[in-house]
Structure formats: structure tokens, C-alpha cells
Curated annotation (Swiss-Prot):
Organism annotation: Macaca fascicularis (Crab-eating macaque)
Summary of subunit composition and partner proteins: Heterodimer of UBA3 and NAE1. The complex binds NEDD8 and UBE2M. Binds APP and TP53BP2.
N6-acetyllysine sites (modified residues): 6, 317
GO molecular function: NEDD8 activating enzyme activity
Keywords: Acetylation, Apoptosis, Cell cycle, Cell membrane, Membrane, Ubl conjugation, Ubl conjugation pathway
Protein name, UniProt field: NEDD8-activating enzyme E1 regulatory subunit
Record-annotated site: Interaction with UBA3: 187
PTM notes: Ubiquitinated by TRIP12, leading to its degradation by the proteasome.
UniProt KW Ubl conjugation keyword: yes
Region of interest (Interaction with UBA3), residue spans: 307-320
Family of this protein: Belongs to the ubiquitin-activating E1 family. ULA1 subfamily.
């Protein structure tokens, strides 16, 4: 019987448990997130992380609370003005090593570069967030982020009808569609129907699978001919056959290893296994060895089938064929894991059965995201010019907003303030900001043109942090933090820019 506390938790987090499961929720509840600066953006991020149940937070804000802060931050009151909030920042850089993720909001460029360097060397993920007028900006800095459960949209079913394993082939052969009672005929799973007619198709086409549109239409006609006829010669209403006809494309997908998985297999981290190798790469190496041996060039069977029209008995039997094969494949991968762990002097239990099963059932969807460091992005010789210049084919591309943010940071470095922070400064700052933009583009060798309209607009922003933009960015940032912590779904790589002017967004690898 389930414990009352567990039931309460399931009721409280029902929706999100459907997204990332118990193990994802456990990761969130054991996470420790550091938020630097409780600005409007920071507060929105915090709110969106508190609600899903993040375990603990540390907020670092060394600034005095001002009237502007009280207006931006709904956690502060007017009575807070003039009082200094608790300073949780320890000057020792190792202070940051305790956190699962660090989120930095509204930090100046010089501070960001120092912080990013510390976290990069400690391999602590950093998410930079910034609201500047009607512009939202996020940058993820993480050396390596492996994802087992990427949850791809429109994932293809793993049915193996083009390469049936022996147990599946034997199961298909147990059906004789030509000598069935009407009830059994109309309750045969569509996977079996397609497999039976595929065998007939092979015999007529020298084993060639239907590939072209015409071939697939001919194959559908072949299935259609198998629908039972009544005494008047009219086709019976057999929904399972109609379901088979609709699922021809799904069923005839080629069983192959995705290129993204091949890239993982060919990665140095997968080839060279040491005692320091993370569990993901040990599992990936074991998977690679399984493919080369027991899998005969194929990944482990996923072990799931879609819902379909069939009687319970037939459906469960078919489901069990796939499930048993999935268990058998997972056990084979597990043997490779055990041998690898032994070879590097690691305990067999250092990789759990749960991790193993999770990897095998998601073996076609593994992802590894590697972001560039902030130092590389800001380096004169390492800046990604190609990404910027190619994006500037459209003069209103969101990359322009990135260039403007770099320009206002240069303005801040030169003048000790952001452009247009006071109304009387807006006009005089236009020329100064344009000069900063020109200097930045020349220094980095970026031969692109930015419209004067953007310079004027950024001066009018006055470094304001409108709550509408902060709220949007807070939700988006919290989503990325959750992805990082749960290691589920795929984070963007590596820069995200939102334009409140056009209500569009884009990602760039900078």
C-alpha cells in the first residue's frame, strides 16, 4: 500500500511527474540552485523553480535595496528600501562548487567573465539571464551535458518489422489470417497484419521493402484485399485492418542507428574509458559493444508498442514478445557494463539497474550537448564570427540584439553607467553608444551593419527591466534549469535571444 506522504506528493506534482517521472522529481528535490541578484528576472526564475519543488536555494545579492528594486521585485516592500539584504557570497571561489546550477541575472560583463571562468573550471553549469528593455537574453555555459531522456517530438516506434528478431518472427508465424474465425480476424493487432502481408510482399518482390509512394500504396491495397467479405461480397467493417493501412508508414520505418548515436559511439570519451569516466560514457561504450556483438548492428529493442485495436490476449502476448526481448537486450548491455567497470577497477553497483534500463529504453534518443565557454565567446580569436555574419543576412535578425547588448556593456565599461538611464541623457548617449558599437564591431573584425534604429531604441530602454519581459524570461530560464538538473529534454546550445518588439526568438551557437 502506498504511503500517505507519497500519495500527497503524487497529487501535488501530478502534472510534472508525467513529464519527468519520479527520478526527475527526486533530482529536483535534491538540487541546490544559486541565484545571483534578486532582480525582477531573478525573482521570476526563483518563483518558477520553487513551484516544481527544487530542494534548496541560495540567493546572493550584495546590492542595497532601492526604490527601483522594490518596484521590480514582488518579494520586497517599500519598507525594505535603504536596508542591505543578507550577503550570502563568500569571497572564496570554491563557494560555488556546492551548487547544482548557478543562475546569474543582470551582472556586468567583467563580473560575468570572472564567475564563468570559476564555474567552467569547477564544471558547475551556469545560466546567464538578462532583461534589457524589450530584449531577453540567456546563455548556457556547461562543458558537457549528456541527456538520456531527450523526449523527442514524434519519436518513431521501434517495431523491427523490417528486421524481426527470432522471437518476433516466431510470434508472427503463429497467426494464420486465412483460417481464422471472424472475431479473431477482426481483433488481430495491426502490427501482426502488416508483418503477415509484408512477408507476402517480399515473396513477390524479391525481399524488397516498400519504399516509394507507389509501392506503399500497392502494399496498402494488398492489405485492403485481406479484409473479410460478407455474403454479398462487400468488405466487412474491420477496424484493425484500417488501422494497419493507416500505420504503413510507421511500420515500414527502417531500423537503423541514428547519426547522433554514431557520433556518441565515435566520441573520444566513449572510446577511452578510465576510472574517472562518468557513468553515461561507460553506458554508451557498453551500448556500442552490444551493437557490435549481440545487437548485430542494431540498438537494444525499446520494448514498447502503441495502443491498437485487438483483444487483450493477443495484445498482451505481442507486448510481452517485445518486452522480453528488451529485457534480454538490457541484460546483455549490463554484462558489457560489468566488464567495463571491472576493467577500470570500479564496483559493479556503481551503475544501477535503473540507469541501465533507462539507457536501453532510450538508446535511440541519447544526446550530448557541449557549450563553448564565455571566454571563448568573448575572445578576439575565438569569437564565432561565422554564426554572427551569416545571421546578419537579415538586418533585423535577433543576432542584432546580441550585438547591441555587447555594445551597451562596452558603454557601461567606459562610462560607469548604461545609456539613457536618465531621460536627459538619452539624446547625448545615442552618439556614444553608436561609437561603442562601431568600436566593438571593428575590434572583433565583424563587417556587418546595424541600423541606427537599434541604437536609438537601446538608449530609450535605459537599462530598464520591464516585468512583462522578465516574467517571460523567468519562465523560459526555469525550464532550462529543470532540464539541466533532471538531465531530461535537450537544453539549447548556447545563446537564446527574445525580442519583445517583434515577439520572436532565436538560438545561436556563439
Amino acid at each position: 500500500m502506498a504511503q500517505p506522504g507519497k500519495l500527497l506528493k503524487e497529487q501535488k506534482y501530478d502534472r510534472q511527474l508525467r513529464l519527468w517521472g519520479d527520478h526527475g522529481q527526486e533530482a529536483l528535490e535534491s538540487a541546490h540552485v544559486c541565484l545571483i541578484n534578486a532582480t525582477a528576472t531573478g525573482t521570476e526564475i526563483l518563483k518558477n523553480l520553487v513551484l516544481p519543488g527544487i530542494g534548496s536555494f541560495t540567493i546572493i545579492d550584495g546590492n542595497q535595496v532601492s526604490g527601483e528594486d522594490a518596484g521590480n521585485n514582488f518579494f520586497l516592500q517599500r519598507s525594505s528600501i535603504g536596508k542591505s539584504p543578507e550577503n550570502l557570497l563568500d569571497n572564496d571561489p570554491s563557494f560555488f562548487c556546492r551548487f547544482t546550477v548557478v543562475v546569474a541575472t543582470q551582472l556586468p560583463e567583467s563580473t560575468l567573465l570572472r564567475l564563468a571562468d570559476v564555474l567552467w573550471n569547477s564544471q558547475i553549469p551556469l545560466l546567464i539571464c538578462r532583461t534589457y528593455g524589450l530584449v531577453g537574453y540567456m546563455r548556457i555555459i556547461i562543458k558537457e551535458h549528456p541527456v538520456i531522456e531527450s523526449h523527442p517530438d514524434n519519436a518513431l516506434e521501434d517495431l523491427r518489422l523490417d528486421k524481426p528478431f527470432p522471437e518476433l518472427r516466431e510470434h508472427f508465424q503463429s497467426y494464420d489470417l486465412d483460417h481464422m474465425e471472424k472475431k479473431d480476424h477482426s481483433h488481430t493487432p495491426w502490427i501482426v497484419i502488416i508483418a503477415k502481408y509484408l512477408a507476402q510482399w517480399y515473396s513477390e518482390t524479391n525481399g524488397r521493402i516498400p519504399k516509394t509512394y507507389k509501392e506503399k500504396e500497392d502494399f496498402r491495397d494488398l492489405i485492403r484485399q485481406g479484409i473479410l467479405k460478407n455474403e454479398n461480397g462487400a468488405p466487412e467493417d474491420e477496424e484493425n485492418f484500417e488501422e494497419a493501412i493507416k500505420n504503413v508508414n510507421t511500420a515500414l520505418n527502417t531500423t537503423q542507428i541514428p547519426s547522433s548515436i554514431e557520433d556518441i559511439f565515435n566520441d573520444d570519451r566513449c572510446i577511452n574509458i578510465t576510472k574517472q569516466t562518468p557513468s553515461f560514457w561507460i553506458l554508451a561504450r557498453a551500448l556500442k559493444e552490444f551493437v557490435a556483438k549481440e545487437g548485430q548492428g542494431n540498438l537494444p529493442v525499446r520494448g514498447t508498442i502503441p495502443d491498437m485495436i485487438a483483444d487483450s490476449g493477443k495484445y498482451i502476448k505481442l507486448q510481452n514478445v517485445y518486452r522480453e526481448k528488451a529485457k534480454k537486450d538490457a541484460a546483455a548491455v549490463g554484462n558489457h557494463v560489468a566488464k567495463l567497470l571491472q576493467s577500470i577497477g570500479q564496483a559493479p553497483e556503481s551503475i544501477s539497474e535503473k540507469e541501465l534500463k533507462l539507457l536501453c529504453s532510450n538508446s535511440a534518443f541519447l544526446r550530448v550537448v557541449r557549450c563553448r565557454s564565455l571566454a571563448e565567446e568573448y575572445g578576439l580569436d575565438t569569437i564565432n564570427k561565422d554564426e554572427i555574419i551569416s545571421s546578419m543576412d537579415n538586418p533585423d535578425n535577433e543576432i542584432v540584439l546580441y550585438l547591441m547588448l555587447r555594445a551597451v556593456d562596452r558603454f557601461h565599461k567606459q562610462h560607469g553607467r548604461y545609456p539613457g538611464v536618465s531621460n536627459y541623457q538619452v539624446e547625448e548617449d545615442i552618439g556614444k553608444l553608436k561609437s561603442c558599437l562601431t568600436g566593438f564591431l571593428q575590434e572583433y573584425g565583424l563587417s556587418v551593419m546595424v541600423k541606427d534604429d537599434y541604437v536609438h531604441e537601446f538608449c530609450r530602454y535605459g537599462a530598464a527591466e520591464p516585468h512583462t519581459i522578465a516574467a517571460f524570461l523567468g519562465g523560459a530560464a526555469a525550464q532550462e534549469v529543470i532540464k539541466i538538473i533532471t538531465k531530461q529534454f535537450v537544453i539549447f546550445n548556447n545563446t537564446y535571444i527574445y525580442s519583445g518588439m517583434s515577439q520572436t526568438s532565436a538560438t545561436f551557437q556563439l
